[in-house]
Amino acid sequence: MSDLYDLGTGEKRPFWADAAADEVEARDPDEPVTIKGGVSPSGVPHLGHFNEIMRGYFVAEALRERGYEVRQVFTTDDKDRLRKLPRKLADLDWNVVGLGEVDAGALGRNLGRPYTDIPDPFGCCDSYGAHFTELLRRSAEAIGVPIDLVSNTELYAGGDFDAAVEDALANRDTAREVLSEFQDKVDDEYVPFFPQCAECGLLTETVTDIDLDDGTVGYVCSDVEAGDDVIEGCGHEGRATFRAGKLPWRFEWPAQWRVLGVDFEPFGKDHAEGSWPSGKAVSREVFDTEPPVPMVYEWFTLNGDALSSSAGNIITVDEVLELLEPAVLRYFFTKNPKKQRDFDVSNLDRFVDEFDRFEAGYFGDESVEDDERARADRAYPMVVDELPERQPVRIPYTFAAVLGMTDDRDLRLQMAQRSGHIPDDATDDQIERALERVEKARAWAVRTDNEFNYRLAETLPAVDFDAETAAALDELAAFVETESPDDETLQGEIYETAKRNDVDVGDLFSAGYRLFLDESEGPRLGPLLSAMDETFVVERLRREG
């Protein structure tokens, strides 16, 4: 077995998923091979949750290529207790709202209860847990990854965990001994089971007796700690079956491996240093089950800060797909799992450019470095919906943002063809697919309010320039008409034209922005004008239309 942190780094294979698949295959697994991930549906599912889904997906695809039948399971740990109130929630249309916009009191009164026993704050699903699980399902569907969502609540209710619960309770002395190696405050009274109070619904931790023959435990509904807070128990004394409660996380996770027959599971570095070592020991010593092949990944950050549903610093898959094509988003997860990555929305253009180079590498662009081409050979077929016969036509993201300044589809096409980003012999399908990026880039410009967040003035604005500025604009029009300059040549000519006509260069740029954007400022004018239809530019510079 490779070191926990080395598996999947790409040091053994050009694409890390192949190295992970090698480890799984070396165990000669039964089919279907089961790849697992999981999340507690505590709030809005965000991009970070897709680390497990996408890492698992690429390993699953690598194994499928080798002829294995693979099942990709994702557990929604919806029998976990609500420990604190999230700052943000989302309805099923992905409208993100603050806690104050729903019945926060109803959520507060349900602290300590399982997510599936808490009413949906939007009133559309069976429970809080069902609501956020549905959002997760829709996100996976939107990104095009077929996962089998499994509810922990349903597994408990169906008896799937019965044997694991019985083993944990029957071997509770061993369980205590194992857990005490990884966790403080494990005394002789510790029992690895949380009964659910029949009176108030709280998951309590005070077990008074165990009847293995009857499959029940006695309990007292006592106070439980939730972070820095204490949730008061109601004091009820009763009995609970193995299905009316749950295992603690450090036992439930390895129990899932046994119940679902898990062969491979990626997880974040937080589990690598805590839950994984204890889970591995519990799996072997309490459940007599070999743990799956593990793989650790680094977390993502969002604009430099940790992604967190509870803290409200999130970006959803739905939001990202407004800004990027699905293949570009999937590509994000092909990168080395060992390195932390920041999803910086303001610099998405750089990331899209990186994807375009990656794609070009797959199609043999020799300017792409050898190691990147090797990775593209393996990973590119997994990130696209359908492998194209020839390289797709891609408009650079920032240029697409320029095209997004107008809603005129014909003008967009003219500008893209004029710039050479869409070849004249492109098919109708290639053109439509290339232009799809324009709406994505426009959404990015609006979201970040960057230098591309302007609208092209499609009719001549009301302008009045002094004689020197008017002469400079006419001279610039003649230059464009006769020279058909590229973007940098035109940018330089604007400076030279201003000097020759004794016009302040800032004033000449402002005049250009007024003519084309009806604004006093804007993006670099040379690249903007060189991207447009030449006749349109000449006529506008001459104030003719």
UniProtKB/Swiss-Prot annotation:
Pfam families, per the entry: tRNA-synt_1f
GO biological process: lysyl-tRNA aminoacylation
Substrates-to-products reaction catalysed: tRNA(Lys) + L-lysine + ATP = L-lysyl-tRNA(Lys) + AMP + diphosphate
EC id: 6.1.1.6
Family matches, as PROSITE patterns: AA_TRNA_LIGASE_I
Motif extent ('KMSKS' region): 306-310
Main localization category: cytoplasm
Keyword terms: Aminoacyl-tRNA synthetase, ATP-binding, Cytoplasm, Ligase, Nucleotide-binding, Protein biosynthesis
Entry's localization field: Cytoplasm
InterPro entries hit by this protein: aa-tRNA-synth_I_codon-bd_sub2, aa-tRNA-synth_I_CS, aa_tRNA-synth_I_cd-bd_sf, Lys-tRNA-ligase, Lys-tRNA-ligase_SC_fold, Rossmann-like_a/b/a_fold
Cellular component terms per the entry's GO annotation: cytoplasm
Motif 'HIGH' region boundaries: 41-49
Broad class of enzyme this protein falls into: ligase
Gene Ontology MF terms in the entry: ATP binding; lysine-tRNA ligase activity; tRNA binding
Similarity annotation: Belongs to the class-I aminoacyl-tRNA synthetase family.
UniProt protein name: Lysine--tRNA ligase
Source organism of this protein record: Natronomonas pharaonis (strain ATCC 35678 / DSM 2160 / CIP 103997 / JCM 8858 / NBRC 14720 / NCIMB 2260 / Gabara) (Halobacterium pharaonis)
